[in-house]
Amino acid sequence: MRQRFDYPIFSDREIATRHQAVYQLMEQENVDALLIYGAGRYASDVYWLSDWPSSREAYVLFQTGKEPVILLQLFNHFPMAKVMSVIKDVRWAGANTTSSVLDLIRERGLDSKKIGIVGSLPYQVYLRIAEKFPGAALSDLSGKLRMMRTIRSPEEIDRIRFASKLTDESIQALAGGLKAGMREDEIAALIEPAYLKRGGYAGIHFMSSMPMREPDFPVPSQFHSNRKLQKGDALITEISGAYSGYSGQIHRTFSIGEGPTAEWKKMHDAAMEAFEVLSKVIKDGATTTEAEEAAEVIHRRGYSTY
């Protein structure tokens, strides 16, 4: 029988700390409930609160003095949520999700209360709530919840470190397997085994190939072509290996069949200089302005940022 402990989980203490932070936010903002929405890979708020990596649309309702509730789609995703979620009241949202949300608000006696909203709630749902419950006061607390989440816990940092290790291993596999004649769209087969063998998955693997002497695309592309790598090409990459809701990221440029041209080498040296300067500046207490000022080395070397 499947159980929660068969999957990567956060400790009970970690989850309790998160839930307590939500209730403190509700008290601070003077709301009676918090309705959190997420869908697919854009459901990190739901994941953070439930320890279940939501797969389709889902709503989580927190309410002072009552246990939280999850409404989710689809019906065949319901059994997995029941196993993994630390929130025990998990419900299928039925044939009409919006109607189920309205029913939950009514069931919980929130039809004339203050409800905070987190996430990009579909306009149709927001409109129905506002029309059905004109006495309810809705306010957007997305930014405040996410600002609270920006300070990572030790358990979260452990996951980020492991995801970053998977990312490093994938880039090493890429370096060892690239060769002229490969298609762009088959390169992912070099990358993903590093994640999959360790219980991870691909966050992103954006890539663009082009002749070094005639570059024609400014960024790693989100969709891969069937173009074949050739001697004298550059392959620019943006790779993220992920593990249970957290990912690393690495950018690397590869030259195919020969070393980098003088211009590519010069550009790489400028990027390395910027990285080394930034790595010294970015620390506890640093501001984004300070980081941007440190990155000005790119402009001083004659380049622009895209």
Per-region residue spans from a language model:
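Active-site neighborhoods and metal-handling regions in enzymes and metal-associated proteins
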Residues: 1-306
